[in-house]
Swiss-Prot record:
Catalysed transformations (reactions): alpha-maltose 1-phosphate + [(1->4)-alpha-D-glucosyl](n) = [(1->4)-alpha-D-glucosyl](n+2) + phosphate
EC primary class: transferase
This protein's name: Alpha-1,4-glucan:maltose-1-phosphate maltosyltransferase
Transmembrane segments: none
Active site residues of this protein: D414, E443
Gene (name only): glgE
Species this protein is from: Mycolicibacterium smegmatis (strain ATCC 700084 / mc(2)155)
Molecular function GO terms recorded: hexosyltransferase activity; hydrolase activity, hydrolyzing O-glycosyl compounds
Entry annotated with the keyword Transferase: yes
SUBUNIT field: Homodimer.
Amino acid sequence: MRSGWVAGRIGIDDVAPVVSCGRYPAKAVVGEVVPVRATVWREGHDAVSATLVVRYLGTEFPRLASGPGTTPPAVPLGTVVQPGKRVKPQILQMSKGRTPDVFHGEFTPDAVGLWTFRVDGWGDPIATWRHAVEAKLEAGQSETELNNDLLVGARLLMRAAEGVPRKLRDPLLEAAQQLRTPGDPYQRAGGALSPEVADLLLQYPLREFVTRGEVHGVWVDRPLARFSSWYEMFPRSTGGWDENGHPVHGTFATAAAALPRIARMGFNVVYLPPIHPIGKVHRKGRNNSVTAAPGDVGSPWAIGSDEGGHDAVHPDLGTIDDFDAFVAAARDAGLEVALDLALQCAPDHPWAKEHPEWFTVLPDGTIAYAENPPKKYQDIYPLNFDNDPDGLFHEVLRVVKFWISHGVKVFRVDNPHTKPPNFWAWLIAEVKNEDPDILFLSEAFTRPARLYGLAKLGFTQSYTYFTWRTAKWELTEFGEEIAKYADHARPNLWVNTPDILHESLQHGGPGMFAIRAVLASTMSSSWGVYSGYELFEHRSVREGSEEYLDSEKYELRPRDFDGALARGESLEPFLTRLNEIRRLHPALRQLRTIKFHHLDNDALLAYSKFDPVTGDTVLVVVTLNPFGPEESTLWLDMEALGMEPYDRFWVRDEITGEEYQWGQSNYVRIEPAKAVAHVLNMPLIPYEKRLDLLRRE
C-alpha cells in the first residue's frame, strides 16, 4: 500500500492487471489487447461508473533495484508511473461486468515502453435518476407524484449539457425542456430516456464525486517478446565430416549455411549456446567424463581460457568479424540471433586470475568450484556477486553491451535463479534503458517463487515445467497456469534441451515427438526446439537419465538433415507446418484466452484459443498416446467459442486439410499413424462476444 493512501468518496478495489500490489509493471506487447478490471462501489442505491485513463510515458524501464557505486538509485514503481510532465491520456469508458460492481475496459498499446493506467470511479447521477424514474413509471405513479423527479432530471440534463460540445447539445436541451413541460409523465420523460440521449451521455457523462485510482504500470515489449519460435543449434557441430567420417569442427560460416533450413521450418529465433573460448583446466570429456581425451572439445558452458572470456569468440569458430557476418546472414534469413549469457567461468578464465574477488575463495586459498552435493563440477567456478558488486555488476553490463554492439538483441540467460535478484533487476533496467528492444529469456527450472519472481524483475520470457507435464490433468493445470500468470510471465515451451531428454521421448517413438511439438507450439505463444529433435534423437546415456547419449554438450554432433528428410525419417515437414499454422492464426499468439474442453478419455486433450482483435479461433484436439488410436466424445464449451448450444458449424483441420460439420458434442478419433492431433480452424467469434469472453471474471 502506498504511504498516504486514504479511502476515496468512491471505492476502487481489486484492480488488474497489477503485479505484486503494484511493485512491478505488468507485461504486454505492441498491438496486444490489455484487459483491465476493477471493483467500483459506493453507498446506497446510487449508480457508479468507471473510466480507464491510459498514458504512454516513453521508453525508460523502471529501476526496481539499486545498483552499485554511482548507479542511479532504485525508484518505487508507484513513483515512476506518475508522469513528470503533462502527457495527454486516453480516456476510455469502462463497462459493467457480470458480477455486480465489477467494471471492465481494454487498451491496446502501440509503442514499446512504459505505459500506465488508472481506474477512476465516479457517481453517475443521471443513471441513478433514470433507474428510479423508470421504476416509478412502471409502477404507474401519476404526474403529480413524479413531478419533482422529472424536474430533477431536467436540472441534471442541463448540467450535463455544459460538458457537451455546443453543436451536440440540442438533444439534451430538448429533453430537459420536455421534462419541464406539464403533461403525461411518459411523454415528459420520453426524451430523457431515449437511446439518443443515452448514447450522447455515454460519450459525455455527468460525473460526480470523481475518485482517482492508483496509477499502475505496464511494460510493453516488441511483438517477438510474446510470439516466437526458437531453434537451438551448436555452431561447432555444423562442419560435417572429413573423408574418413570424422566430425569436423564447424565455424560461423558453416553455421550460417545452416540458417536457410532453420528459416524454412518457420523458426524466427536461432539460439546459440556459449560461443566463447572453452576452459582447458579440468575440461570434461565425452558423456561428461571427468577426464578429457586429446581432441575433446569440452562443454561450451565452461567459459574462458587463455584465449579469452565472455567477450571473445572461440578461435575454432572464427573471429568476431565472422560472428558479425553470421548475425547478418541470420537477419537476411528472417532470424534473430539469441546468445547464451552464462555467468560462470572455467578455472582458466581471465577473471579467475585478474579478479579472484569475483569468486568464493576457500581457506586454503583456492577458488571454490561448483557443487550440487554429492556432485562436483571442477570445470566450473561460480561467481560471487557480494564481494565486489560494483566491479562485477559493471563488468557483466559491459559484456552484454559488447554483444549488443555486434547485433545481438536477445539473450538466453543460463540459470538466472542462482544469481541475486537485485543484480538482474539492475542489469535489465540498465540494458533496456539504452535499447528497449533487448529481450531476456530466463532458463530457470526452479521453484515457482524464483521462476515467477525473475519474470516480475524484467525477464521477457521464462522456461517452464512443461517438459515434465505429460498427463492430461498435469497439462490442463499447466495451461490454466499460463493464463493465470499472463500479466507478468510469458512461458517458452521447449520440447527438449541439450540437458533434458524426457523419458516420454526416450520411449514414445516418433509419435511422441509429434505430440510434444503440437502441445508446445499451441499451448503457449513461444516454443523451442533443440537441434536433433527433428531426427527423433532419443537415446539416453543410461536408463533413468535425462542426459543424451553422446551429448552434444561434450562433443561434435554433425547431422545429415537432408538425408533423413529424403528417407522420410524426419519431423521437419511437421515442424514446418506447425509454424505455418502459428503464423496463420493470431489465436495462437495468445496467452490469456486458453480454454479446455471436456473429453471422456484421459488419453485425449482439447483446448481452444481466440484472438481478441480478429476473433480468430483455434481448437486443438491432441492424443497423448503415440502408439494407437484413441476416441471419445468431445463436449465443447460453446460459450467459450462465442456460440449458442444449438449452433452447427464447419471446421477445417489445418494439419490434414479435412473439413467437418460439428456442434456442441462431437465424436473424435485420433490415429497417430495418420496425425497426432486436430488443429481446427473454428468460426470467427463476433466482436461483442469475444469482448465478453476476454472480460470473463
